[in-house]
């Protein structure tokens, strides 16, 4: 038959661990309800525990041995487990969510409320002192009160076991043994004060006592100018001296501070919504993005720009090429604007500086069939200003969708789609985009062609049309050095 141990036997424990930690396993005293269960007992305080896991945190007296410390600035408390740290963190919160249903007292922790509810227990008998008339809810408080009366008369004997003591303090400590609490060594004053000879039971009592030496009074009464060094002294002062003010606070209605804070939050969200998401047609047509937020709100060094009524340049062109704009925006004439503070990059869109590919695609659709070729001469227009105005209207009338389609048609590259074909052909040279066409020239043909193009505007100054683009500059050596007569674009190489 196999025997299973419910706890660790005492003979398995390491003697070295007992010396370092200060605890050992001792069997429970035999009695009427003798059991084989082994319990742990602290050698220092004599506190019994059901297992070693509960005794181990108890045997860590120094704060540096407790791994979980409170992150608050002036707290300095450390704990042996995460649970005790989280339970302690509730005391630093300004909110007290646990309220007593009988006296409206608030508590940070639920166990504190549970201990407080024992004072309102109707099943508990009220212990009445016949000498002074005080009532007590606990037997320990009642016995301690009777011991104080007996000590004042000179009797230092326990009324339960008739044991005599030398001082009143020793008698009060002995009374805890009759209230099912650990007496004697468990309540030894082992925490001394660094400034005087007094000793205390816990480190909390030492910190509370330090107010006597430092003179700090951090607790201010909200009804008067009086300050206190301890919070319990402030609470006692408020209940004693300002009881009428406390009653007025309880009877006052709820203020509207929460509603005002909610409305301010909504207003901020409404200010930011046109910038963070796509606005409607009315907002796009009537309001400009530079004037959405008040510029002086976040810094006085930023100059405020007047609202011009033109949408931001990045709004229309941040969409991918080939996608149509979801909103139908009508062209709006804008007055003369100041130069921008920051220079726009290559991704910005300016109507007066269009790429050459867009100009060629627009010229192909203009009424009158304007052409850039000097091989087909046309009669010169007597009014070049009218033609320039006609070109400006055509540029403004073009929608962003057509602009993106023209850009896509001239810059499509199929090399990443046809890269799997086993073609051992010479590499493609950088194409020269002229009017949306991709052409390749040999090295022998490139130089005479450039010379011809440069001489054309000088030979026929008035026969090329109303537009004059000036002499063409020669290509840099990066683009002309590697040209070949047999080179074709990649799209045609794939289908040779």
Swiss-Prot record:
It is found in: Nucleus. It comes from the Eukaryota. A zinc finger (C2H2-type) spans 68-92, 98-120, 127-149, 156-178, 191-213, 219-242. The keyword Zinc-finger applies. Pfam families: zf-C2H2, zf-C2H2_6. The keyword Manganese does not apply. GO terms for cellular component: nucleus. Its main location: nucleus. GO terms for molecular function: DNA-binding transcription activator activity, RNA polymerase II-specific; DNA-binding transcription factor activity; DNA-binding transcription factor activity, RNA polymerase II-specific; sequence-specific DNA binding; zinc ion binding. Keywords: Activator, DNA-binding, Metal-binding, Nucleus, Repeat, Transcription, Transcription regulation, Zinc, Zinc-finger. Belongs to the krueppel C2H2-type zinc-finger protein family. This is Zinc finger protein PLAGL2.
């Amino acid at each position: 038959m196999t025997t299973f141990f419910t706890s660790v036997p005492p003979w398995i424990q390491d003697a070295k661990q007992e010396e370092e930690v200060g605890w050992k396993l001792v069997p429970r005293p035999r009695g009427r309800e003798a059991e084989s269960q082994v319990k742990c007992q602290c050698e220092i305080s004599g506190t019994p525990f059901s297992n070693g896991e509960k005794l181990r945190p108890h045997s860590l007296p120094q704060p540096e041995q407790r791994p979980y410390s409170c992150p608050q600035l002036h707290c300095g408390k450390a704990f042996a487990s995460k649970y005790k740290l989280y339970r302690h963190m509730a005391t630093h919160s300004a909110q007290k969510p646990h309220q007593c249903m009988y006296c409206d007292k608030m508590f940070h922790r639920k166990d504190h409320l549970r201990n407080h509810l024992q004072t309102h227990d109707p099943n508990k008998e009220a212990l009445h002192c016949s000498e002074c008339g005080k009532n007590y809810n606990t037997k320990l408080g009642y016995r301690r009160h009777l011991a104080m009366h007996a000590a004042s008369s000179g009797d230092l004997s326990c009324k339960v076991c008739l044991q005599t003591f030398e001082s009143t303090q020793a008698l009060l400590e002995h009374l805890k043994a009759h209230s099912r609490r650990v007496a004697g060594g468990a309540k030894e004053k082992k925490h001394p004060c660094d400034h005087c000879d007094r000793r205390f039971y816990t480190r909390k009592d030492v910190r509370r006592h330090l107010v006597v030496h430092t003179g700090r009074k951090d607790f201010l009464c909200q009804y008067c100018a009086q300050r206190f060094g301890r919070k319990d002294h402030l609470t006692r002062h408020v209940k004693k001296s300002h009881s009428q003010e406390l009653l007025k606070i309880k009877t006052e209605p709820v203020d509207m501070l929460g509603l005002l804070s909610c409305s301010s939050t909504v207003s901020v969200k409404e200010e930011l919504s046109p910038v963070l998401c796509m606005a409607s047609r009315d907002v796009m047509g009537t309001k400009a993005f530079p004037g959405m937020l008040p510029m002086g709100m976040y810094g006085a060094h930023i100059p405020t720009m007047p609202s011009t009524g033109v949408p931001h340049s990045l709004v229309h062109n941040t969409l991918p090429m080939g996608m149509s704009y979801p909103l139908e925006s009508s062209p709006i004439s804008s007055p003369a604007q100041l130069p921008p503070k920051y220079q726009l990059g290559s991704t910005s869109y300016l109507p007066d500086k269009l790429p050459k590919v867009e100009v060629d695609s627009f010229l192909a659709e203009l009424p009158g069939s304007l052409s850039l070729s000097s091989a087909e001469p046309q009669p010169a227009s007597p009014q070049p200003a009218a033609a320039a105005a006609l070109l400006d209207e055509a540029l403004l009338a073009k929608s962003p969708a057509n602009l993106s389609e023209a850009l896509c048609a001239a810059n499509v590259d199929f090399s990443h789609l046809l890269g799997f074909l086993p073609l051992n052909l010479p590499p493609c040279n950088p194409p020269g985009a002229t009017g949306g066409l991709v052409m390749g020239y040999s090295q022998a043909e490139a130089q005479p062609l450039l010379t011809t193009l440069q001489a054309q505007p000088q030979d026929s100054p008035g026969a090329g049309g109303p537009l004059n683009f000036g002499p063409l500059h020669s290509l840099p050596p990066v683009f002309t050095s590697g040209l070949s007569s047999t080179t074709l674009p990649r799209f045609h190489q794939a289908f040779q």
